[in-house]
Amino acid sequence: MQTQSSTESIFPEQAGYFSVPGAHLYTVLHQVTDPVARVLLVGPFASERHLSYNPWVRWARYLAARRIEVLRYDYRGVGESTGVFEEMSFGHWSEDIQLLAGWMAGRSPRVPFILHGLEVGAILAGRTFDEGSGDALLLWSPPANANQALGSTLRQWAAGGRQLYESSENRRSASGYIRELQEGAFVQVQGYLWSGRLWRDSFHFNMPTTLNEENKVSSDSKRPVKIVKLGKDASPLVKPFRGYLEVTDFSELYSRNFEWIASVLSSPIRKFNEEND
């Protein structure tokens, strides 16, 4: 992994590019000395990236300040990663997280590895965890399927800022855009060109049914799982998004979720302990 150091905080943040088939993922490693755990942050879908960016980065720094090494990244075709977004699929993004998870979990020294996802990122993290990656899983507001997240984004975008730039005769409702996607057309949403194929596939990109009951899966697999439903007060991490200039205090959210991670690290049921005794 090629990296370039940043000095924006007291903890080293290494920005670089991670090679995947046909593209390079932009990554930032929040590196710590003598980590007690590592976390891979799987962020929300493309069109929400810029809105949730600030609290997502602050969360990574919060964890790093508590000796948890964090890797965050942009999806293939999104943000500063390379790749053509309209050519991407959930399969590509699933492949990316598998490769990143393997790299992160294999870093030295070996410590517990936690997958953490937000909205569509929660589905990606959940599916990767279900396939055997990770010693614990933390999910924020996972939808039942990706279409729930895409649909709510499209509706808010169609009802909000999108219409400010259109003449009255060119304004369309969310249902109009959905109809175009269903017919196979491309629709630009928050700067990203959604394809009809992506829209169709989103209905079938689901959370694993094995993760429906977090307590049961934690007990059965001996790998802790926590699912958190974020409220409207968690904007701009989740929809509906408020104004760009509003600053939300996430200290309580960060604290509660860190406490869960800390409890996981002291728990004897960790798969990591069983494999490394």
Predicted segments with their positions:
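Short, surface-exposed "cap/lid" segments of acyl-processing enzymes
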Residues: 20-22, 31-74, 80, 103
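Glycine-rich nucleophile elbow surrounding the catalytic serine of serine-hydrolase chemistry
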Residues: 116-129
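Structural motif
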Residues: 36-39, 114, 136
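Catalytic nucleophile-loop/oxyanion-hole region of alpha/beta-hydrolase
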Residues: 78-108
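The alpha/beta-hydrolase serine catalytic core
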Residues: 133-272
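Alpha/beta-hydrolase fold nucleophile elbow
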Residues: 107-119
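Terminal, non-globular segments
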Residues: 15-17, 27-28, 72, 262-277
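N-terminal cap/lid segment of alpha/beta-hydrolase-fold proteins
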Residues: 1-37, 250
